[in-house]
């Protein structure tokens, strides 16, 4: 085995270990697993956003930034802003956006501290406990008419304007559309 092959193998092993640790730490620190939105579901979420091309689009808990990258690819005029609390996942999102040459802002921050007052559209895939906290935050910060699309989990005190089921595997993923 050549020295280059050994170095490459070492890097691959380190990346696999880092990714595994990221999943464990994400679960232990944030009390939620890192679960990326399937691309089929992401495409439906972007469709439900009814983007015109000039909006400020946020993804709170953006993970690898796939929703923002997809939205930006389909609507280049939008301003895409994401927040991700876990540093290694944030780095993954930054790298993905860089590799795909997708100009977007990705903040390493908690969804509850992100300023969403100028948002036109917000994407969410967060746990039920966070949905309750975000509902209060949105009531205080969002301007009228903001569209919020949530993957899997509804807001506890708000009725969606639309519910959509997306076939996934042997079942369905539910999407909830809200207007503030």
Q: Where are the regions a protein language model picked out?
A:
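S-adenosyl-L-methionine
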Residues: 1-52
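Conserved class I S-adenosyl-L-methionine
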Residues: 53-63
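Conserved SAM-binding loop of SAM-dependent methyltransferases across substrates and taxa
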Residues: 66-76
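Conserved SAM-binding motif I beta-strand of class I
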Residues: 79-84
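Conserved SAM-binding loop
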Residues: 93
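Conserved SAM-binding strand-loop segment of SAM-dependent methyltransferases
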Residues: 100-111
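A short SAM/SAH-binding and catalytic strip from SAM-dependent methyltransferases
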Residues: 119-133
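C-terminal substrate-binding/active-site "lid" region of AdoMet-derived donor-dependent transferases
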Residues: 130-180
